[in-house]
Amino acid sequence: MAQRIKQINKWTGSILICTAFLLIIGACNNQSELSESMLEKGVSKELADWRKENLSHLYYQLFFSIPENRKEAVTGSVTIQVDKAEDVPLVIDFRADKKQILSISVNGKKKPEYQFINEHIILPSQILKDGKNEIHIDFIAGNQSLNRNDEFLYTLLVPDRARTLFPCFDQPNLKAEYTLALEIPQSWTAVSNTLVYSDLPKNDKRVIQFMPTEPLSTYLFSFVAAQFQKETRTNNGRTISAYHRETDLKKLNQLSTIFHQVFSALDWLEEYTDIPYPFAKYDFVILPGFQYGGMEH
């Protein structure tokens, strides 16, 4: 009899293990075809194609708090609005340590179920809605693409480094509209892809809010914050500003020539392509020790 009970207990344990295994498999199946290669580090072509097919109408609302001491972390938040297809999860890229994810909410619900695997935040379909979803993530920004100096900071997100800075869908063919707010030291100013909407004091800092961008790929999103000098010129109704930290008078005297070349280049491009300049503004930033001769953002 004791032997019989022992055998029944063994079978029961096996059934429970099998049931648990089936539940795990079922949960995986609900993730709608997420293959192993799709969850590799980086963004595989398979993942990029799958997201392009299943996601649309992307919008990022971003905030970064930039301390004056470059040894202190840059903290941030992102609210992602995205339409998704029926019964599919979301795979959001974030090349950082899991401890840099401070909090997540999904459609207003805090502390949702999620996984963090190989630089991907995976939100299961069960906690999402078919159609429009809103994801809010508080995080510590990665430093890899934050080029920080004691008196300035600039992002450089090419070719695939946006995900080192903030959680996003880091592939060029998922363009999105961005709004950005920066909390920076009072003596600094900031430049981004679009015009400034507001600039307000906040204790010993200032908060600069920028207008929404046109649809952009993640690698083109950019901002610079520094103790800048600003020079502005207008030509044929077009106004351009230059931001710099130069004190050498000989170099500063070259600004007029630089402005002339920029205005001429834009006029030539419009004439050659027969396409008006499509963005809200054009500015340029001159930085010491920049890695490349120039970079468009």
What are these regions (language model features)?
Residues 14-24:
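Bacterial N-terminal signal peptides
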Residues 27-75, 147-151, 172:
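N-terminal, polar/Ser/Thr-rich
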Residues 81-98, 170, 178-185:
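Surface-exposed beta-strand/loop patches in extracellular or lumenal glycoproteins
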Residues 95-153, 204:
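A surface-exposed beta-strand-loop module
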